[in-house]
């Protein structure tokens, strides 16, 4: 649990997807996943959900964001999805206005006990209380439905009030720092 094996597996999956669709069009990885859905109605529904988010974020500023694991290491496995939902992935929490903690094997309830001592007051996300805990099973995008749900979660976290899919409290929570 919580080891680098999961990160390597996700990075391998992304490498395979990037190889198939090319580096120039990041959104193609979502399209590739959605195109693999056999049920035409479900495929259309998933595409509509993605299109809704994409349309809204066209008119919004990008949000500097970082995803950390339980050792405060940067997790880059979801960077492509972060970019597609209007995030600007960062490598250092000092540059991120939004901080998300997520790691496979660590549900939100467990993260609640681990995160407080890891936070640094000088981080902008901590200063502005933009810290989120993401359930371990939700921060995955290996299948189309998971990817779209993860995209909706990220949209809610990055743009509170602009996107409301009803996932707060179920798949992620806002962790108040002030």
Identify the role of each PLM range.
Residues 1-178:
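N-terminal ligand-binding lobe of clamshell/alpha-beta domains
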């Amino acid at each position: 649990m919580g080891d680098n094996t999961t990160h390597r597996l996700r990075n391998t999956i992304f490498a395979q997807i990037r190889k198939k669709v090319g580096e120039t069009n990041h959104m193609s990885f979502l399209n590739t996943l959605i195109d693999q859905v056999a049920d035409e109605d479900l495929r259309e529904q998933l595409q509509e959900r993605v299109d809704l988010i994409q349309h809204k974020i066209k008119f919004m500023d990008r949000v500097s964001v970082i995803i950390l694991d339980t050792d405060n290491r940067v997790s880059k496995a979801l960077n492509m999805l972060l970019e597609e939902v209007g995030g600007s992935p960062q490598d250092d929490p000092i540059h991120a206005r939004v901080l998300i903690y997520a790691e496979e094997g660590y549900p939100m309830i467990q993260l609640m006990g681990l995160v407080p001592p890891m936070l640094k007051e000088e981080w902008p996300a901590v200063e502005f209380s933009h810290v989120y805990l993401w359930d371990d099973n939700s921060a995955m995008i290996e299948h189309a439905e998971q990817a779209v749900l993860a995209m909706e979660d990220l949209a809610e976290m990055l743009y509170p009030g602009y996107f409301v899919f009803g996932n707060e409290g179920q798949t992620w929570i806002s962790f108040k720092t002030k």
